[in-house]
């Protein structure tokens, strides 16, 4: 009986070890043989043709001197289905000149094939009124058991995305977020959240947050008094706060009332000039009063009344 030694194992890695032209995975080695019987210290040769030794996933060529080469088609479903850390083995028997057999064992190691993710990747919500949007992702992955997601909640900058293992997702807007409340009508913000399939392939879901008009809060001096003939002017200052960015102000404007004119500045200071020639003013007797109510508006259109006696 001959003694067979040498390299009788090989290792391949899905995709990584593949020839870029042929997409074949290959491994090589050399067996040694010692046989005391004259003329039998060699192997039965097989080439990569009809006489190649066929394994379960590939084929093996061996020469008389023990040099062998193993080749497998990298595109096979069984190989492409391997994930990182998974493996297949292909055991092929070679034969020496006297009929003694020996196993050559080739291990095919898997690698992570990136998933392909599609479906609904965008959504829209609106401050105050529409706080939720939803969609569904699709995922395909040639690696067995990896065509799915995990149930998870992912915090974005403006809300939270809830993802199920089947790919359906729901986004809840945090309506109390200062950035959200600062959005005015016609302005938008985006919240981009990255999700991952089971194998770690990333995919982005982008949510558009539409702003709405938050009414300003107006305070300060909203009344004044003038007197026919003697005191024809009065003034005051309004205050304004508005969570919508850039809207906490007024506009420089002159507003005609029924008995005079109000002059308003952008910072809220106002002056009222009585039209002393107005017949209604001149018709007032001592102890009699009239009122002139004038409506002003902040930058976002919030109305406020100033009443002059």
Predicted feature residues:
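Acidic active-site catalytic centers that drive phospho-/nucleotidyl reactions
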Residues: 35-37, 90, 98, 113, ...
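Extracellular ectodomain surface segments
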Residues: 3-54, 116-157, 217-258
